[in-house]
Amino acid sequence: MADWVRALGALWGSAGVAAVLVYAAFRLATYAADAVMAGLTPLEWLLLVVNCVFMAWAEGYRGFQLRFSPRVAARALHVYEHPTRARLWFAPLFCAGYFGATARLKRNVWIGTALIVLAVLLFNRVPQPWRGILDAGVVVGLGWGTVSLLVAARATWRERRALVAAEVPAMAGL
């Protein structure tokens, strides 16, 4: 397979995942902005700041920077080194771990997806300004996650070496 096709597949994997994060952050940012524009009490401002700091640490640093982003970058490198049609066409899904992954990773990805859907359904029922306060923290986490993903992808691509295991089973044909 041509080198440029493999490189494009790896780029599609990382950029596709980053695009989903950016899209979600922009969608949620409108709710956070609505809450701030409507005016917050001092207690609500305090909770907004505490939530943003907590989500930066929990979602951004621990979730994305230490786990998700390096793994997505490692799997994008795997797309480049071991391309298949499925991996190239569906590179963002492969890089996120939805297929061609260890049983543990697939289980964690699907459980994580279900929990995100549940959180979205629950957050939709929360009135303003509380929804905006919650969404502001998620936006901070997603922003951190996007930046950490781009940094991890660049470092992995530059070194041509994954920073963490790609968590691909030994006999993965997809």
What are these regions (language model features)?
Residues 103-141:
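Hydrophobic alpha-helical transmembrane segments and immediately flanking/interface helices
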Residues 36-74, 148:
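Hydrophobic alpha-helical membrane-embedded segments
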